[in-house]
């Protein structure tokens, strides 16, 4: 999970660099905003994973967290329909 969050951050950074090199900084910011809005549940889940990776988590807490991630994923899929 932490690897996915890292990959996501790198992809967003590369996208921003590509857009700003073309001189479209405003367009890049708008695109990142759209990207965030479209994938906000995954970004929030990645943020939570990062926070929990630094602290101690019991198995029960981890299971509750994974249920929240799955629920957020289902909500996102429903919002796309």
Swiss-Prot record:
Signal peptide positions on this chain: 1-22
Spell out which residues are annotated as carrying 3',4'-dihydroxyphenylalanine: 36-37, 41-42
| Tissue specificity field | Hemocytes and pharyngeal tissues.
| Main localization, broad class | secreted
Q: Which residues carry this modification: Leucine amide?
A: 54
Superkingdom is Eukaryota
Subcellular location field = Secreted
Post-translation changes = Contains L-DOPA (3',4'-dihydroxyphenylalanine).
Keyword terms, alphabetized: Amidation, Antibiotic, Antimicrobial, Bromination, Hydroxylation, Secreted, Signal
Write down a Pfam family by its short name: Styelin
5-hydroxylysine sites (modified residues): 40, 44
- Residue span(s) of the pro-peptide: 56-81
User: Tell me, what does this protein do in biology?
Assistant: Bactericidal against several Gram-positive and Gram-negative bacteria. Plays a significant role in the innate immune mechanisms of S.clava.
Q: Please give the name of this protein.
A: Styelin-D
Species per Swiss-Prot/TrEMBL record: Styela clava
């Amino acid at each position: 999970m932490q690897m996915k969050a890292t990959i996501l951050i790198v992809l967003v950074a590369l996208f921003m660099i590509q857009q700003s090199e073309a001189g479209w900084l405003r367009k890049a910011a708008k695109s990142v905003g759209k990207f965030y809005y479209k994938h906000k549940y995954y970004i929030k889940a990645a943020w939570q994973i990062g926070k929990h990776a630094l602290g101690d988590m019991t198995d029960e807490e981890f299971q509750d967290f994974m249920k929240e991630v799955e629920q957020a994923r289902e909500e996102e899929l429903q919002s796309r329909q």
